[in-house]
């Protein structure tokens, strides 16, 4: 109950900040069918998830990535395991309310994992930032943290450029879920930098 209350509180907060419509669904076994978690082997009996819903607009996916990852990090602090799920779920079997003008973009599965997640191969800092060698320490920390962010298929198709002062340009490559991945990476970048970032 405490975990549900914590997640509900986080979701309400970030929905308000981001003008989103994320929803927590508990004890609902149908969204994943039989295939997803059997393939990944990460959770036992997943019936809880956050539905990442928001307006049909260009910036929604990045915002869902950014705010969704904030919730993920809080959930992990509370001892929960999480998994971003972009494709392997059944939209028709989810029991969520999608308002007019909104769309379901992805889910975050939440549960008590059978095992801890593994570390995946990552790019080097220089591969995602041409400014890494000459930028301030806070920027380097941001890049280092961004490389720890989960991305679809571990593709890490994002790039950070230091523009002087606290200004940073974040851009993405082409591919599935790169908008959401960029939002997740920006969340990690801010954590690493430890200072307010003015995104350009």
Kindly give the residue locations of the regions a language model identified.
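Acidic, surface-exposed loops and disordered segments
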Residues: 1-200
């Amino acid at each position: 109950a405490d975990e549900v209350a914590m997640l509900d509180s986080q979701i309400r907060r970030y929905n308000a900040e981001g003008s989103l419509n994320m929803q927590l669904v508990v004890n609902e076994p149908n969204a994943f069918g039989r295939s997803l978690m059997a393939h990944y082997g990460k959770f036992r009996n997943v019936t809880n998830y956050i539905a990442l819903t928001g307006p049909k607009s260009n910036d929604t996916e990045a915002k869902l990535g950014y705010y969704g990852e904030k919730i993920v990090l809080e959930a992990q602090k509370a001892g929960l395991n999480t998994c971003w799920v972009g494709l392997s779920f059944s939209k028709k079997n989810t029991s969520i309310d999608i308002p007019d003008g909104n769309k379901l973009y992805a889910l975050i599965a939440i549960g008590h994992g059978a095992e801890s997640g593994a570390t995946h191969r990552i790019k080097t800092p220089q591969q995602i930032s041409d400014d890494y060698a000459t930028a301030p320490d806070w920027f380097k920390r941001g890049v280092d943290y961004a490389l720890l962010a989960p991305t679809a298929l571990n593709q890490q198709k994002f790039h950070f450029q230091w523009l002087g002062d606290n200004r940073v340009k974040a851009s993405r490559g082409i591919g599935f879920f790169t908008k959401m991945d960029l939002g997740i990476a920006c969340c990690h970048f801010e954590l690493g930098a430890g200072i307010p970032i003015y995104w350009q």
